[in-house]
């Protein structure tokens, strides 16, 4: 996939969206029902706690073909920043821009960057965060 991004940098925004789908910053979010409602045949009473697991919804087999495969051509639909409305992440545009610039600059400077070990994750049920990501940079691109 790295080579495809180098050959066609127009795919970088797709890589950003697919990364956000597969690796959202937060694993879940909890809300309190403000009124009685029904969701997918399940009654939810006012005051009950409801948890939305981003890591599950973003890999829902009924919604995504091969949900555990990173696919640069996948349609950009995910809940990494919420589902809109009052509880939508205000930092969405900045987060996307930061990821886009990071990918553009890293791939331009180090086109042979590669994974050099197993990523270590922070042990948390709430945040989806890396503790370490071993990589080899390879030789810098010619200036």
List each model region and its residues.
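Cytochrome P450
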Residues: 1-143
